[in-house]
Amino acid sequence: MKPSVILYKTLPDDLLQRLEEHFSVTQVKNLRPETVSQHAEAFAQAEGLLGSSEKVDAALLEKMPKLRATSTVSVGYDNFDVEALNARRVLLMHTPTVLTETVADTVMALVLSTARRVVEVAERVKAGEWTKSIGPDWFGSDVHHKTLGIVGMGRIGMALAQRAHFGFGMPILYNARRQHPQAEERFNARYCDLDTLLQEADFVCLILPLSEETHHLFGQAQFAKMKSSAIFINAGRGPVVDEQALIAALQAGEIHAAGLDVFEHEPLAKDSPLLTLPNVVALPHIGSATHETRYNMAACAVDNLIDALNGNVEKNCVNPQVK
């Protein structure tokens, strides 16, 4: 008899077929309490869980006494109560490698679009404001050979450094938990403390996961240390930044602009001051959102769940110690 799993995300037909070859699959729209109640028996019998973006906490785990593994279609897992998973010896699988290059592309797009004011200027053209040769009020800033500061030199940070160093001749500063010899050798990157990075970088790119340690790592004090000409990019997790402090820094001219793919609360509220600022490029958390990469992430998540329920946790497992 096949193990039972709950699927709370739509999959391409071929991936759903692959999942069904290995498991008895119950598809649900979400993991809200009313949904769990409607499918109580399926949740009670499920040994696996696959999806993304929904909260998986102790209350849900109480309804799933047979759960052995959960697989998220994402690299981030801050929506999972890892402590509760560990207590129940439930494996947590994620997709850390397949989205690296695509997210780095998005970060570089934010660097370019903020510096060159691409979104703002394009909207002015659409509004009919281009009636003569443009003047300085349409100009942006150079990207090439400017100093890029990367906070978080993981896979995505490395991919960003590659683009910036080889493509744009940008000197690289970085701050991370530990020095990264490969980054220093390949990109001539310079390790420095956060204050030094903030003071020297023309672009500050934040690529950090959310944790107790990183929550509101960036606030008023950090923005005050940046150059007034500096551009801030966040493509990690929204709550790593005190959003009100960011808004205040932008409004006061303490920093020049911001490119944001993540926010403290998502979706971003329609009345957010960020949406009124012309020097802000706001994206709807599209870091990995290409057809190709989202397919590859889903395929990886399916394979991860198959591996986990077969006792294979050699890759992509957050908590292999609970096996």
From Swiss-Prot:
Residues the record marks as active site: 237, 266, 285
GO molecular function, one term: hydroxypyruvate reductase (NADPH) activity
GO cellular component, one term: plasma membrane
InterPro entries (alphabetical): D-isomer_2-hydroxyacid_DH, D-isomer_2_OHA_DH_cat_dom, D-isomer_DH_CS, D-isomer_DH_NAD-bd, Glyo/OHPyrv_Rdtase_B, NAD(P)-bd_dom_sf
Reactions the enzyme catalyzes: glycolate + NADP(+) = glyoxylate + NADPH + H(+); (R)-glycerate + NAD(+) = 3-hydroxypyruvate + NADH + H(+); (R)-glycerate + NADP(+) = 3-hydroxypyruvate + NADPH + H(+)
Location in or out of the cell: Cytoplasm
EC number, UniProt record: 1.1.1.79, 1.1.1.81
Keyword ATP-binding: no
Class of enzymatic activity (EC top level): oxidoreductase
Assigned keywords, A-Z: Cytoplasm, NAD, NADP, Oxidoreductase
PROSITE patterns named among the record's database cross-references: D_2_HYDROXYACID_DH_2 (PS00670), D_2_HYDROXYACID_DH_3 (PS00671)
Entries under Pfam families matching the protein: 2-Hacid_dh (PF00389), 2-Hacid_dh_C (PF02826)
Complex and partners: Homodimer.
Function recorded in the entry: Catalyzes the NADPH-dependent reduction of glyoxylate and hydroxypyruvate into glycolate and glycerate, respectively.
Membership in a protein family: Belongs to the D-isomer specific 2-hydroxyacid dehydrogenase family. GhrB subfamily.
NCBIfam families, A to Z: PRK15409.1
Protein name: Glyoxylate/hydroxypyruvate reductase B
Origin organism lineage: Bacteria, Pseudomonadati, Pseudomonadota, Gammaproteobacteria, Enterobacterales
Gene name per UniProt: ghrB
